[in-house]
Curated annotation (Swiss-Prot):
PANTHER family: BIFUNCTIONAL 3-DEHYDROQUINATE DEHYDRATASE_SHIKIMATE DEHYDROGENASE, CHLOROPLASTIC (PTHR21089:SF1), SHIKIMATE DEHYDROGENASE (PTHR21089). NADP(+) binds at E79, G127, S128, G129, G130, A131, N151, R152, T153, Y154, E155, K156, M219, G242. Its EC number is 1.1.1.25. The keyword Amino-acid biosynthesis applies. Pathway: Metabolic intermediate biosynthesis; chorismate biosynthesis; chorismate from D-erythrose 4-phosphate and phosphoenolpyruvate: step 4/7. This is Shikimate dehydrogenase (NADP(+)). InterPro entries: Aminoacid_DH-like_N_sf (IPR046346), NAD(P)-bd_dom_sf (IPR036291), Shikimate_DH (IPR011342), Shikimate_DH-bd_N (IPR013708), Shikimate_DH_fam (IPR022893), Shikm_DH/Glu-tRNA_Rdtase (IPR006151). It comes from Caldicellulosiruptor bescii (strain ATCC BAA-1888 / DSM 6725 / KCTC 15123 / Z-1320).
Length: 288
């Protein structure tokens, strides 16, 4: 049996194994996907050494906090990873480790599903880590020309200017000044508000008087409706959580590992529905 992993920290509540194993079962692939918590970069190094030696390991996903650290252990990177400088998917092929990023694809497709147009919009991204980089790259691929970025450590937001200098304009915003500008779209890429700290929010809409956004997105999927999204919804703003992004990026990763094609139109909704039944998270219905 082939092996796949999700590596990172604090994976206790991750539903990625359920989603990936659901995909593997759908296509009768003899493989299993498991979580593996790594406490530090030394454990990351040991894991990579194990992957290279174990012929049954096909690849793995990476989540917080190793999406950037993993690059030094990979032999080749895709074009989007070269730009983003963060990877969430690695495939082992002919003894080499190849790094990809499917996060931006999942993010982009989930926005497209909602009919969100980012062209000529004022967009604020909260956070500046690997998830933020994938988000910004996805926005660029959808036609965005500039993005405001607010991070608690201003210098980290400032560094994104260099990362994306060749493709779009990054406008760093000091964390305490994030309420001073009018935005059409606000996107949270931080872990603030994630289970179990569900009362926390990275943005206080009661303090935001510069204008009302038309769309608010939270990459968090547990809970499905974070405090951030609840506050936005009370203001009449359209909202979206990160569950569709999670499923879309998982499907893209499986396509990289196993060349899966011909997904049924309802397959995404079937997985979302299965997630609802098994975890009490979902709010989606299968169509047709």
């Amino acid at each position: 049996m082939k092996k796949l992993f999700l590596i990172g920290k604090s994976l206790k509540h991750s539903i990625s194994p359920f989603i990936h194993n659901r995909i593997l079962s759908e296509f009768d692939i003899d493989a299993i996907y498991s979580n593996l918590e790594l406490l530090d970069t030394e454990m990351l190094k040991e894991f990579v050494e194990m992957v290279r030696k174990d012929e049954d390991v096909v690849g793995f996903n990476i989540t917080i906090p190793y999406k950037e650290d993993i690059l030094e252990f990979c032999d080749e990177v895709s074009e989007d990873v070269r730009i983003i400088k963060a990877a969430n998917t690695v495939k082992k092929e002919d003894g080499k480790l190849l790094a990809y990023n499917t996060d931006w694809i999942g993010f982009k497709r989930s926005l497209e599903d909602r009919g969100v147009d980012v062209k000529d919009k004022k967009i604020l991204v909260l956070g500046s880590g690997g998830a933020a980089k994938a988000c910004i790259y996805g926005l660029y691929r959808m036609g965005a020309k500039e993005v405001f970025v607010a991070n608690r450590t201003y210098e980290k937001a400032e560094k994104l200017k260099e990362v994306f200098q060749d493709i779009l304009k990054i406008l760093p915003v000091e964390w305490l000044r994030r309420y001073e500008f009018k935005y059409d779209i606000i996107i949270n890429t931080t872990s603030v508000g994630m289970f179990p700290n569900i009362e926390s929010s990275p943005f206080d809409f009661e303090n935001y008087v510069a204008g009302v956004p038309v769309f608010v997105y939270d990459m968090i999927y547990n809970p499905l409706k974070t405090a951030f999204l609840k506050e936005a919804e009370k203001k009449g703003i359209k909202i979206e959580n990160g569950l569709k992004m999670l499923v879309y990026q998982a499907i893209e990763a499986e396509m990289i590992w196993f060349d899966i094609v011909n997904l049924s139109p309802n397959f995404l909704l079937e997985i979302l529905n299965d997630t609802e039944k098994n975890f009490g998270l979902g709010i989606y219905k299968v169509i047709g």
